Amino acid sequence: RRQRQMCIRDRVRIDALTTSIKEHAGRDFNLNSPTQLGEILFGEMKLVEKPKKTKTGQFKTDEQTLSSLAGKHPMIDEILEYREASKLKSTYIDALPEHVVSQTGRVHTHFHQLVAATGRLASTDPNLQNIPVRTEAGREIRKAFVPRGDGFTLLAADYSQVELRVMAAMSGDKGMIEAFQQDLDIHQATAARVYDVPLDEVLPEMRSTAKMVNFGIIYGISAFGLSQRLGIPRTEAAEIIETYFEKYPGVREFMDHIIDETKENGYVETLTGRRRQLRDITSSNQNIRGNAERAAINTPIQGSAADLIKLAMIHIDAFLREAGARTKMILQVHDELVFDLHRDEEDDLVPAIVKRMQDALPLPHGVHAKVDTGTGANWLEAH
């Protein structure tokens, strides 16, 4: 029933967006044709002075290009919304009912251990790890995931800032470790350091920039990449990154050490000793070498976080079986575990689950994993 309601709402929204976009254009055209869309946006409407082009000479209309133009014209925003709504409809709203197994009446995703090079689990048929939570349509889809019946509720147990905690632990950076030990908002704490202001004077835009840098550093973000994401000059982005490393010197030392060690060994390791071969780190090709260096930085962090949650899953599964619990672990979404929780077991099981998640893999330098939990009548409400 909820799926039918979502399907109708999404179809109505897509139709409304289609009509509005074509009114802006002043004529009918195929919204799904990059060539036609580019010609209207940049050839006819001339929304940008010097629009980017592909190697074949067509105007670029990919998500990154259009996202960088968001707010310049209502049509751009509506096209981005149209694309997201269309993707959600085809990927989830229309497709999920086809994945319901007749014998159980449930959707059963497939997990793969050898798809992501860092060791993260991947989900397919259907992919339940990629349902957006920041959009209204994505939230509606999450509402469709409910417990098995009366007496049950959904429990979401989510590692808090796990990759940044792993980076603090592996780098041994005193400032970052201190922020976590004091249970500070790490993005607010980083903003206070980078902008040299007291914690209570950090503005929302400062925190937003710090958040982008915190996560970007894990993936080896460049000054150019940060400037593109924040819409600021490259020189300003470079200054922010440099200040970040001045405030967190242990992070820079860790990254330099990891790259040097990987060049020497040809591989990088997670906290559990799981290795990823990175022979390209000594390549004479700058682009290939750069990609390998970013992987060398990211793999120990993301890979150790992946090891942590998989070890937690093993411990929790064994615990639930031994306890004869009616509660079942039903889904893993990177840093989150979802349970079909029997209400009578909530008081005993939730603390036990949290403890096993926190203790699954001891982190160096006194850094502790933190787990946030929530329950609800559906997956959305559990957050």
Predicted regions and their residues:
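Conserved "right-hand" nucleotidyltransferase catalytic core of DNA-directed polymerases
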Residues: 1-5, 9-136, 146-153, 160-163, ...
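Hydrophobic alpha-helix feature that most strongly marks membrane-spanning transmembrane helices
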Residues: 11, 15, 26, 42, ...
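C-terminal polymerase-core module
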Residues: 16-19, 23-77, 246-298, 344-383
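Conserved, non-catalytic sequence blocks in retroelement Pol enzymes and Pol-derived host proteins
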Residues: 31, 179-181, 301
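Conserved catalytic core of nucleic-acid polymerases
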Residues: 101, 107-109, 113-116, 192-326, ...
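Flexible glycine/proline-rich, aromatic-decorated loop/lid segments
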Residues: 133-140, 182-189, 283-285
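Gly/His-enriched, cation/cofactor- and phosphate-binding structural elements
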Residues: 139, 152-153, 162, 326-328, ...
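Conserved catalytic alpha/beta cores of large enzymes that bind or transform nucleotide phosphates
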Residues: 142-167, 178-211
